Amino acid sequence: MCLDDKQQGMVFNIQKYSVHDGPGIRTIVFLKGCSLSCRWCSNPESQKSCAELACNPGRCIDISKCGHCLTACPHGAITCGDDDKPRIDRSHCADCSIPCAEVCPAQGLLVYGKKRAVGDVLRVVEQDMAFYARSGGGLTLSGGEPLLQGSFAVALLREARARRIRTAVETCGMVPADTVREAAPHLSYVLYDIKHMNSEIHETQTGLPNARILENFRILAEEFPHLPILARTPVIPGFNDNEKAVAAIARFIKAYPHVNYELLPYHRLGTQKYHFLGREVPMGEVSLNKAVTDGLQKTALDILGERVQIPR
């Protein structure tokens, strides 16, 4: 089948040389859009499905020395702040993004998200074929929720496999079941987030209940039993950082012998991007005690044994 390069998706980053998002050395393609609104999200720029204008004031050379962005914005959404840096009025900004960011010589204004074709993305991915061959790596789709852009994600996976590239997806599972079934035959590996087994608690911190997430996990595990799955739980203070929550997830996973499990300690690496987007950091200054994570690792090990992976 010929590649239809008219198939496009909204991509906000392509990251090379990753060793934490699937086996071997991988290239991660980040797609925009997610149905969940997790308070701890480290990629806030991934949540909306459209391109977004952001401001990194540390790169701005000062409005008084430049000011191109003030006149470039067709909506009058950019003004000069007291610190001589741009201020974006989000109530007026249409996220057309391009005029303001294009005229910024220092990249103080930047755009998260760009329409890219399947072939364009895979040309970047193919640059590291030698690394994939030696390490067992390949392409990982991430986000956001990559399967929310269902047809584009499946087209990427299908074409990657046709080019002998191993494929993986990082998913929260909050997508239509048909999309899961369509993507699965083109996957070599799945990283699947299970955040909480209690649907009401899940909804308080992510915005949605978990029934669809758990059902899609069952679909993958039962209908595609030869597909390796790594279930992952981000350990979040005040949400699931307790033995009861982790034990419930581990017991759920135990029914599927080909599924491994990993706990991901909470971190604050994405906080700066919230500021770039003019948003408050939902989690504030909270942190996770390492002793808590170590205790929860033991809880998981007691239930799943060697199927528990310790983060590198």
Curated annotation (Swiss-Prot):
Residue numbers binding [4Fe-4S] cluster 1: C34, C38, C41
Span of domain Radical SAM core: 20-304
Residue positions binding [4Fe-4S] cluster 2: C60, C66, C69, C104
Record-level GO BP terms: alkanesulfonate catabolic process
GO molecular function, one term: metal ion binding
Residues bound to S-adenosyl-L-methionine: W40, C41, S42, G144, D193, I194, K195, H267
Keyword Transcription regulation in annotation: no
EC code(s) of this entry: 1.97.1.-
Domain of life: Bacteria
SUPFAM superfamilies linked: 4Fe-4S ferredoxins, Radical SAM enzymes
Domain 4Fe-4S ferredoxin-type, chain residue ranges per copy: 51-83, 84-115
Keyword Metal-binding attributed: yes
InterPro entries: 4Fe4S_Fe-S-bd, BssD/PflA/YjjW, Organic_radical-activating, Organic_radical_activase, Radical_activat_CS, rSAM
PROSITE patterns: 4FE4S_FER_2, RADICAL_ACTIVATING, RADICAL_SAM
Function: Involved in an anaerobic respiration pathway that converts the sulfonate isethionate (2-hydroxyethanesulfonate) to ammonia, acetate and sulfide. Catalyzes activation of the isethionate sulfite-lyase IslA under anaerobic conditions by generation of an organic free radical on a glycine residue, via a homolytic cleavage of S-adenosyl-L-methionine (SAM).
Assembly behavior: Monomer.
Family under the similarity heading: Belongs to the organic radical-activating enzymes family.
Protein name: Isethionate sulfite-lyase activating enzyme
Gene source species: Desulfovibrio desulfuricans (strain ATCC 27774 / DSM 6949 / MB)
Upper taxonomic lineage: Bacteria, Pseudomonadati, Thermodesulfobacteriota, Desulfovibrionia, Desulfovibrionales
